[in-house]
Design a protein with these regions (language model features):
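Specificity-determining recognition surfaces
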Residues: 1-31, 42-43
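Residues within well-ordered alpha-helical secondary structure of globular protein domains
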Residues: 9, 32-35, 61-65
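Glycine/small-residue-rich phosphate/adenosyl-binding loop
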Residues: 49-128
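Short secondary-structure junctions and interdomain/linker hinges
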Residues: 14, 36-40, 66, 70
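Short loop-to-beta-strand entry elements in the cores of soluble alpha/beta enzymes
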Residues: 40-52
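Short amphipathic alpha-helical surface micro-motifs
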Residues: 26-32, 94-99
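Short secondary-structure boundary/capping segments
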Residues: 5, 39, 104-106
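Short secondary-structure capping/turn segments at boundaries of alpha-helices and beta-strands
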Residues: 31-37, 46, 101-102
Length: 128
């Protein structure tokens, strides 16, 4: 398959089979990703590989405030996480909103979670 075909026909998967991902496959993926563009090509990224279920559960919990905000903004007819138009949804309403499972459960269900970090002091932030 040509790259152009792959890009145009591959969907954005949000469901997981529960199938384990071998270290070899994971390292192959990360090695290939290493060649992707980065700010100024300075490679300021790091990846933490998480397989421990208790840590994946904690990552899911850390996502709860963002998931609640997303749902509250959608319910209010807003475009969630919009950087141009500030939200009119009150903090109390956001806190009382039930988060959507699709924004939190995937962290728990995946066989592995990759946490990507970038040192902004290293890369060139060309999108200022």
């Amino acid at each position: 398959m040509e790259l152009n075909d792959a890009i145009r026909t591959t969907f954005s998967a949000r469901d997981y089979t529960g199938e384990d991902l071998s270290d070899e496959t994971l390292y192959d993926i990360l090695e290939t990703a290493r060649f992707a563009p980065s700010g100024g090509n300075r490679q300021g990224n790091r990846v933490i590989i998480v397989r421990d279920q208790s840590i994946k559960d904690r990552i899911s919990d850390l996502n709860l405030p963002a998931a609640k905000r997303y749902v509250a903004q959608v319910n209010a007819g807003e475009n969630p996480w919009n950087a141009v138009v500030p939200t009119k949804v009150a903090d109390a309403e956001i806190a009382a909103t039930e988060p959507a499972a699709l924004l939190t459960e995937p962290f728990k269900m995946a066989s592995v979670v990759l946490v990507f970090l970038v040192d902004l002091k290293v890369v060139a932030s060309v999108d200022q």
